[in-house]
C-alpha cells in the first residue's frame, strides 16, 4: 500500500466539513491528534461554509445550506442536543447568542444579575486571542426606586476578570450594540442610525470609536439595514427599500484590520448585488431581526420570519432563483446568528 505524504493527507482532511471530519477521529491516533493542531484547525475553519444557528424556546437547530453551486440548492436541519443546556430552566428572554469570527457563542445570565450581553471580541494586538465579553448592567439609582442607569463592563474569559469601563451615552447607545453588532478581527461593529455611521468597539483599547459613514447615504428611515461579515475579513451591509422592497448589498473593498479601522481613513464600499423586489420578503416588519450571508458574490441566503405566518424561514435568492424553506412554524420566541462550524476551542467559563 502506498502512503500519501503527511502534508497532503492533512490538506485533504482539512477540506472535509466538520460534521464529516469528526467521524474520522477514531481512525488512528495521528488523525485524532490533528484536532489539537492550531494550523489544521485554522485551515479547516477558513474553508468552512457559513451556517445558521436557530434557537427557539424548545429546540436548537443548526441549518446547513447544501448545493449552492447547483441549480436546486436546499437546506438540511440538524436538531442539536440541548438536554444539558441550563437555559431551558430559565426565562428565555435572558438568553443571547452571537458570533465572534464566525464562532457561535451562547451566553446565559441569571435574571437577578441584570446583565445584557452585547458581543464577544478580543485584543487583536496580542499574539494569543484572549476573548472578552462586552456587556452592560441595569443599575438602580436608589434601592427603593425603579429608576435605572446603564453601566458598561468587560468580562475576560480566560482570567474571569470583570471590570466596568467609562462611557458616554452621548456617543453611543449600548442597546444598538446588543441588537446590531457583528465581530470582525476581534472588534465589534454596529450601525448608528442617528448619524448614519458604523461605530466600533476596540477591545485592545477598550473604547468606542467611529469607523465610517454608511455607503447608502440616502435612505428612508423606514428602510431595513443589516450589517454582517463578508468573506471573513470585510463588512457587508444589506439595505432593503421600504417602498420598493429592492435589496442592495454593499461590501467594503479592502480587508478590515488594525491598520485601517482607526476612523481616519476613508472606507471604500462597493455595491456588490442588487436584487429586484420580485418575491423578496418584507424584512422591515420582522420581530426578531434577520441573519444573512453571501455566497460566491451572487447568492443571498437570509433568515427571517414569514410576514404573514411569522414562521421562521430560510430564503435563497440568486438571479432568477428564489427558494423559501420553512423551518419552524411553532416558534414563539427565537434567536439566530450566522456561524462557521469549526473545532477551535473557545474558553468562556
From Swiss-Prot:
Highest taxon in the source lineage: Eukaryota
Record domain F-box: where: 1-48
Residue ranges of LRR repeats: 267-290
Keywords: Leucine-rich repeat
Classification via Gene3D superfamilies: 1.20.1280.50
NCBIfam families according to UniProt: F_box_assoc_1 (TIGR01640)
Protein name: Putative F-box/LRR-repeat protein At3g16555
Organismal lineage: Eukaryota, Viridiplantae, Streptophyta, Embryophyta, Tracheophyta
Amino acid at each position: 500500500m502506498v502512503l500519501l505524504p503527511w502534508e497532503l493527507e492533512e490538506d485533504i482532511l482539512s477540506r472535509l466539513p466538520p460534521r464529516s471530519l469528526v467521524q474520522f477521529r477514531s481512525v488512528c491516533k495521528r488523525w485524532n491528534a490533528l484536532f489539537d493542531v492550531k494550523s489544521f484547525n485554522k485551515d479547516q475553519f477558513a474553508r468552512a461554509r457559513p451556517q445558521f444557528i436557530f434557537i427557539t424556546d424548545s429546540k436548537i437547530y443548526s441549518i446547513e445550506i447544501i448545493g449552492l453551486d447547483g441549480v436546486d440548492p436546499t437546506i438540511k436541519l440538524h436538531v442539536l442536543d440541548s438536554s444539558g443546556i441550563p437555559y431551558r430552566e430559565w426565562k428565555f428572554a435572558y438568553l443571547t447568542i452571537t458570533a465572534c469570527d464566525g464562532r457561535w457563542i451562547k451566553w446565559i445570565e441569571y435574571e437577578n444579575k441584570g446583565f445584557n450581553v452585547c458581543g464577544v471580541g478580543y485584543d487583536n494586538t496580542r499574539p494569543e486571542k484572549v476573548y472578552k465579553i462586552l456587556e452592560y448592567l441595569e443599575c438602580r439609582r436608589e434601592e427603593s426606586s425603579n429608576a435605572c442607569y446603564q453601566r458598561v463592563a468587560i468580562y475576560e474569559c480566560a482570567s474571569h476578570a470583570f471590570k466596568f469601563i467609562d462611557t458616554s451615552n452621548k456617543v453611543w447607545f449600548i442597546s444598538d450594540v446588543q441588537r446590531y453588532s457583528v465581530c470582525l478581527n476581534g472588534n465589534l461593529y454596529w450601525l448608528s442610525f442617528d448619524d448614519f455611521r458604523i461605530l466600533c468597539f476596540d477591545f485592545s483599547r477598550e473604547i468606542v470609536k467611529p469607523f465610517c459613514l454608511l455607503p447608502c447615504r440616502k435612505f428612508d428611515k423606514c428602510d431595513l439595514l443589516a450589517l454582517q461579515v463578508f468573506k471573513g475579513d470585510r463588512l457587508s451591509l444589506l439595505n432593503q427599500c421600504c417602498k420598493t422592497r429592492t435589496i442592495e448589498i454593499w461590501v467594503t473593498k479592502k480587508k478590515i484590520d488594525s491598520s485601517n479601522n482607526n476612523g481616519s481613513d476613508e472606507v471604500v464600499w462597493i455595491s456588490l448585488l442588487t436584487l429586484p423586489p420580485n418575491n423578496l420578503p418584507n424584512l422591515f416588519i420582522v420581530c426578531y431581526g434577520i441573519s444573512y450571508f453571501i455566497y460566491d458574490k451572487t447568492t443571498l441566503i437570509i433568515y427571517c420570519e414569514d410576514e404573514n405566518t411569522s414562521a421562521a424561514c430560510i430564503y435563497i435568492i440568486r438571479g432568477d432563483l428564489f427558494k423559501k424553506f420553512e423551518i419552524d412554524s411553532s416558534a414563539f420566541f427565537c434567536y439566530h446568528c450566522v456561524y462557521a462550524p469549526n473545532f477551535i476551542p473557545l474558553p468562556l467559563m
